[in-house]
């Protein structure tokens, strides 16, 4: 039996998968190898890079033109700035790959000999030089996780490859493929041996090209999910197929995680006589988000980095990016957190990430909340919007000011505290979805609890800006129209200096939107 997997690399005998060599332009790759080019494959984590490298390894070694060897350099990360030990680990990994993949037992002996007589600054180059000289076919090393190396160890590797480059293909590899998360040109290498930051492009200026492994396309998502149908007879409804694409935008790990949860973990999905429905996919999505599975937790952890905050904070606030360094934007795209959307500019990569990021940022505020009685529930357990509004106003007046300090992003602190409160409201019984974008001037929230849907728009009144009430009412009209609702909340956080304390200024009143919808305006 095969299954969807989130622990790569994929094995076609065990896992549903797309043919790895079809995920990139194989003719282009083979052309670069034939031209003796050194190049890079990069993509966000858990997108299939290693699976593609291993498929290429098998493809090349089945032919008679090249001998390819795969080596994962992550083991050298533990040595950080210790060049001798780090480069020794790189040499050993390549030699073991030669032994295990090519049956070249002599490579490990050569590695030991080289390491006894060479320093870390020359060991990799010396080993590759001597190993290639005795080869009947040109050598193609596939070096994975190259960006696990840092500082002096990364510089040492790149410079040795550059130094040996003129000797290819008889006394050095014909082609070297480096694989990692970031494009090498965007590396900013802080080496203890150098007084200035070194860019990857200057340390490895022999690189011919950078290939980026993309996410799945919509047809590829359908093809992958159909593998399960072919094997088991269990179908995905058209709505479920569309929902997987809409939620993930083809991010490979997310596609597999949703499908695995729906088909192999949820009791309804394990019944192969029942189709996988949109509702099952939505339940799987909520499970992944609430449980902060490893992939999502790793992304959320990046929010602590200053260069990530410089981009994500204005996106959440709906303001312009301002003077954000170009490298920060490239970094978030390389991480897979963001993408450039046609006609929209920079945006969060997919709806699941769009949910995870603000939820992660609101976690500390949520943990800081005092005990709150659920006065917003009717006797039958349904949500009462009027009582929820009263509960929020009481909560905000009493706890808003101190809780703002618990939010990690100052510009959106009110948003995060509000979301923390709403997560307490829906705990175990509803969902909270968010919409935000650069320059939109707002964040939209949609709270669903049973049959009740409550939409709200969050705006900030900043120094020097006019009262956002009129703009907010117009914008909220459009949001409510899209949801088919005729009422909602407009929350205006007053962040101007010199305002009365939150406990004194928080108030609400009823307004009509330009299209006649009933709006509760909350000034906080």
Listing of model-derived features with the role each one plays in the protein:
Residues 96-156, 162-175:
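Mid-core helix/loop region of P-loop NTP-binding domains shared across ATPases and GTPases
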Residues 424-451:
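Active-site metal-binding core of divalent-cation-utilizing nuclease and nuclease-like domains
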Residues 6, 68-69, 80-105:
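Conserved NTP-binding/hydrolysis module of P-loop NTPases
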Residues 23, 219-222, 226-335, 341-342, ...:
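Winged-helix-like regulatory helical subdomains adjacent to P-loop NTPase cores
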Residues 469-473, 477-508:
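Nucleic-acid nuclease catalytic cores
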Residues 1-47, 51-60, 126-131, 386, ...:
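Walker A/P-loop-proximal flanking segment of P-loop NTPase domains
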Residues 9-10, 153-239, 244-247, 265-289:
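The catalytic "switch" region of P-loop NTPases
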Residues 62-79:
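Conserved catalytic segments around the Walker B and adjacent sensor/switch elements
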């Amino acid at each position: 039996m095969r299954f969807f997997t989130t622990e790569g690399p994929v094995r076609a005998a065990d896992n549903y998968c797309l043919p790895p060599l079809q995920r990139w332009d194989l003719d282009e790759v083979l052309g670069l190898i034939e031209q003796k080019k050194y190049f890079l494959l990069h993509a966000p984590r858990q997108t299939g890079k290693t699976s593609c490298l291993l498929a290429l390894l098998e493809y090349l070694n089945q032919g008679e033109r090249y001998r390819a060897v795969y080596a994962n350099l992550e083991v050298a990360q533990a040595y950080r700035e210790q060049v001798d030990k780090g480069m020794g680990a790189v040499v050993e990994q390549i030699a073991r790959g030669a032994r295990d993949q090519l049956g070249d037992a002599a490579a490990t002996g050569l590695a030991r000999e080289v390491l006894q007589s060479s320093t870390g600054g020359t060991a990799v180059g010396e080993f590759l030089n001597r190993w290639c000289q005795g080869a009947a076919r040109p050598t193609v090393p596939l070096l994975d996780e190259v960006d696990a190396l840092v500082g002096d160890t990364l510089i040492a590797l790149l410079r040795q490859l550059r130094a040996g480059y003129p000797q290819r293909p008889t006394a050095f590899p014909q082609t070297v493929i480096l694989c990692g998360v970031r494009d090498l040109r965007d590396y900013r290498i802080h080496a203890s041996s150098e007084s200035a930051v070194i860019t990857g492009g200057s340390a490895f200026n022999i690189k011919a090209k950078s290939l980026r492994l993309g996410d799945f396309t919509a047809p590829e998502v359908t093809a992958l999910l159909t593998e399960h149908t072919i094997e088991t007879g269990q179908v995905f409804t058209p709505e479920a197929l569309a929902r997987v694409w809409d939620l993930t935008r083809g991010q490979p790990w997310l596609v597999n995680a949703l499908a695995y949860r729906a088909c192999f973990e949820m009791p309804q999905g394990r019944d192969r006589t029942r189709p996988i429905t949109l509702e099952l996919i939505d339940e799987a999505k909520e499970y992944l988000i609430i449980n902060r599975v490893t992939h999502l937790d790793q992304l959320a952890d990046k929010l602590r980095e200053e260069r990530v905050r410089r981009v994500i904070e204005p996106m959440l606030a709906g303001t312009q990016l301002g003077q954000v360094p170009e490298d920060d934007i490239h970094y978030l795209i390389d991480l897979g957190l963001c993408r450039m959307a046609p006609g929209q500019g920079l945006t969060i990569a997919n709806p699941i990430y769009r949910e995870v990021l603000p939820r992660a940022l609101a976690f500390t505020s949520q943990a800081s909340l005092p005990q709150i009685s659920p006065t917003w529930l009717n006797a039958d357990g349904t949500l009462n919007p009027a009582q929820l509004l009263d509960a929020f106003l009481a909560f905000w007046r009493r706890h808003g000011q101190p809780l703002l300090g618990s939010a990690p992003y100052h510009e959106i602190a009110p948003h995060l505290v509000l979301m923390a409160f709403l997560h307490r409201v829906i705990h175990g019984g509803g969902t909270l979805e968010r919409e935000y974008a650069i320059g939109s001037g707002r964040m939209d929230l949609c709270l669903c609890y049973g049959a009740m849907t409550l939409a709200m728009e969050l705006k900030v009144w900043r120094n020097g800006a006019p009262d956002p009430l009129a703009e907010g009412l117009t914008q909220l009209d459009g949001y409510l129209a899209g949801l088919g609702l005729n009422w909602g909340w407009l929350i205006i956080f007053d962040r101007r200096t010199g305002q009365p304390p939150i406990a004194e200024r928080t108030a609400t009143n009823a307004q009509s939107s330009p299209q006649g919808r009933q709006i509760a305006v909350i000034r906080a």
